[in-house]
Amino acid sequence: YPMIPLSSLFTNAVLRAQYLHQLAADIYKDFERTYMPNEQRHSSKNSPSAFCYSETIPAPTGKDEAQQRSDVELLQFSLALIQSWISPLQSLSRVFTNSLVFLTSDRVFEKLKDLEEGIVALMRDLGEGGFGSSTLLKLTYDMFDVNLRNNDVLFKNYGLLSCFKKDMHKVETYLKVMKCRRFVESNCTL
């Protein structure tokens, strides 16, 4: 295999994370439009199903906190977040059979796996092949539920999609912080 420059690895990882975050936001909006009446949208944001497992790990919650962490830590957090979604996203296409979600769900899983490989490559290049992230987040998210006629299931899936969107935003932020820190660019915005 030819050596890929570190800057290219970061660029590819950031692009994948941006794409996944946008896809997660689109899926969330499509689900909301299709399944959640306006009056339920606000009440569900405060429900226990809106709790994200990622809130249980000591990961930075924004770019200012992320800038205080090492690149290795940010990569470990990113890998833990991504790996917590791999199993749940395998079932996504079975849940939403007739919408934008269905059309994009297989792509989401593939892109998530690509991003996981990219982060593993970055960790290897930065000398962090030990993958210390396994201790960060042992939990994975629940599977998406297929019974969309049940309100509890709707809220659960809505909460999962909300968490996926938040987690992909975190990964995107962490990767951008690392890239900007390492490669001073004129268009480096967070």
From Swiss-Prot:
It holds the Pfam family Hormone_1. GO terms for cellular component: extracellular space. It is found in: Secreted. CDD domains: somatotropin_like. GO terms for biological process: animal organ development; growth hormone receptor signaling pathway; positive regulation of growth; positive regulation of receptor signaling pathway via JAK-STAT; response to nutrient levels. InterPro entries: 4_helix_cytokine-like_core, Somatotropin, Somatotropin/Prolactin, Somatotropin_CS. It comes from the Eukaryota. SUPFAM superfamilies: 4-helical cytokines (SSF47266). Disulfide bonds join 52-163, 180-188. Keywords: Disulfide bond, Hormone, Secreted. GO terms for molecular function: growth hormone receptor binding; hormone activity. Belongs to the somatotropin/prolactin family. Growth hormone plays an important role in growth control and is involved in the regulation of several anabolic processes. Implicated as an osmoregulatory substance important for seawater adaptation. This is Somatotropin-2.
